[in-house]
Amino acid sequence: MKVLTKAASAIGDGLVAGFVGTAAMTVSSTIEARLRHRAASTAPARATAKALGIRAFDSDLAQARFNDLSHWGYGTGWGVVRGILGAAGVPAATATAAHGAAVWGSAAVSLPALDVAPPFVFWGREEVAIDVLHHTVYAVATGAAYELIAAGRRNGGG
């Protein structure tokens, strides 16, 4: 029973941490988009829609809402991986680096596979650097949130 409790806690803590990381990434990408005068990314909605077989949206508003749900769901869900790494005893910095690499790597593979974006080797250095920056913000914020939650749990706070 203790293993199930630890696993459930890791999953729950990871989900909360993933939500925090997604919020941090949203802030960083929103600031960057405004500074560069570009529209928000629609890659989350296009990738999720393609994976689910959704061909069109009734309106731009419906697509924007679906994009937000996809973005928040994806980031929050990936927090589970960070929780599992933490529960497995992987040191915090290593877990955060592995988590960040997994998240960025999965996007780098899945978006071209779904024909949502070209492979990152065709993006140009600046675009790759910006994308890595946002994913690093996500991974570091998720890792920090997970470690704070886990420390609180160890100290009797949950």
Predicted regions and their residues:
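Short amphipathic, positively biased membrane-proximal segments
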Residues: 1-158
